[in-house]
Amino acid sequence: MIHMKQLTSKEEWAESYPIMSELRTELDIETYLQRLEACVQKESYMLFALYENTAIRALCGALPRVSIHKGEHLWIADLVTTAPCRSKGYGKMLLDYASDWARKAGLGFVSLSSGLQRKDAHRFYTDKMGFTIESYLFRKPV
């Protein structure tokens, strides 16, 4: 049985690490848990999980944001499905779940960024999820 929920306890966060580490390969569990706690406390970050029976199969990390330019929206910071479960529609289910959360919260839209090399992900976002490409995201170390 498939079900989704927001993960709120440190135990649930630790349980999510093996899935998130498929996306965030540079993070060990200690760093992951420290950053996750900081994101929740400082940024109102939410971690949604898709379960197949009792096992986490996919994760979506999101946070509400507001900008002068676009107003209130939901930013998808992380989206990952464990490799053996890809192409089962789990990413779509989680993005739909996050979009429903945003709609109920009165937010105007959902946005995300995706690495330039992730061509399959880009097709998924545009062709299957209805996202449009509006900008590049730039980064500079300080």
From Swiss-Prot:
GO terms for molecular function: acyltransferase activity, transferring groups other than amino-acyl groups. Residues 2-142 form the N-acetyltransferase domain. Disulfide bonds: none annotated. Keywords: Acyltransferase, Transferase. It holds the Pfam family Acetyltransf_1. The keyword Ribonucleoprotein does not apply. It comes from the Bacteria. Belongs to the acetyltransferase family. This is Uncharacterized N-acetyltransferase YhdJ. The gene is yhdJ.
